[in-house]
Structure formats: C-alpha cells, structure tokens
C-alpha cells in the first residue's frame, strides 16, 4: 500500500501510519506534501499511489468568506481528482479530512460527490481510526451517497475525460 499524505503536520501522517500498521498488519510506504499544488505535481510524477489523504486545512486561507474558501477547495480537489488515477485500479481514492464546520448535507459534499470524492470524514468521524478504515476500504459510491445524505437529483456529474462530449451537447 502506497499513500500520499497532504496534511499540515508530518506527525499526523506518522500517527496514522502507525495506527494503520497496528490495525491491519500491513506495511505502508508514504510521502507527505504540504500544498495542494504539490499533490498535483507528485501525482504527475508518480502514478503508483493507492490512496491520497488530504486535510482540508492543508493551507492557510487568506480569506474568511466560506463561499470563497469552498470554491478554492473545490477547484483544487477537482484538479487533484483529474490527476488521481493509476494503472492498476483506475481512480485513486481521495480521503478528505474536513474541517469541523462541515456537516452531512453540505452543498460542497454534493459537488465533491459529483467528481468522485466519496471519502470525506466529517464531525466526530474525523479520527485516526476512521482514516485508517478508509485507507483500507474506501467507500463505494452508494455508501458515500448515504453518508453525505445526498439525493440523486442534487448531483451534477463531471466528465472524467475532457475529450468526451456529452450527447446532449452535440
């Protein structure tokens, strides 16, 4: 198992690795990066990661307007999800440790679901043990829909392949 961590403290990554290895008796190779753009660069260089763990608070925000922050976060995660694919499994699951202001049903969760990010941890679920569980077994699309409390008609799916034009746009 190879994991790319993007959390603002290497001690957090080390603690998660230690917990995972004791829970699942499996060795993890890992790397830590500290910026959203560094995640993209690392994935362009190395497609062999099995999981990506990102802390929403990875970078400090210069703005305190939540809408601006959410748009910034979504744009970064959208770009990361575009790069997050490997040759063995396809899409690399992204595990996002959300900030404490997030709740199930938040509008950003619908947008993240639409780009294939099914592993956001919210509220009291933001624990090392739950990060380890998602590293070991990421959520399915159906599980994410239930966890995020999303209705199907809320989701606008985004094409993974920018070269494919939807039929209704032809």
Q: Where in this protein do the model-derived segments appear?
A:
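Walker A/P-loop phosphate-binding motif and the immediately C-terminal alpha-helix
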Residues: 167-170
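Long, basic/Gly/Ser/Thr-rich N-terminal segments
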Residues: 1-165
């Amino acid at each position: 198992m190879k994991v790319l961590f993007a959390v603002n403290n290497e001690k957090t990554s080390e603690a998660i690795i230690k917990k995972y290895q004791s829970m699942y008796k499996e060795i993890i190779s890992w790397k830590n990066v500290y910026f959203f753009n560094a995640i993209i660069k690392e994935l362009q260089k190395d497609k062999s990661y099995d999981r990506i763990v990102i802390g929403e608070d990875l970078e400090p925000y210069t703005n305190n307007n939540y809408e601006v922050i959410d748009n910034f976060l979504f744009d970064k995660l959208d770009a990361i999800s575009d790069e997050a694919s490997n040759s063995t499994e396809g899409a690399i699951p992204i595990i996002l440790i959300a900030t404490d202001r997030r709740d199930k049903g938040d509008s950003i969760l619908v947008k993240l679901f639409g780009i294939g990010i099914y592993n956001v941890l919210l509220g009291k679920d933001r624990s090392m043990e739950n990060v380890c569980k998602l590293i070991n077994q990421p959520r399915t699309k159906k599980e994410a829909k239930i966890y995020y409390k999303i209705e199907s008609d809320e989701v606008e799916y985004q094409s993974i392949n920018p070269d494919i034009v939807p039929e209704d746009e032809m």
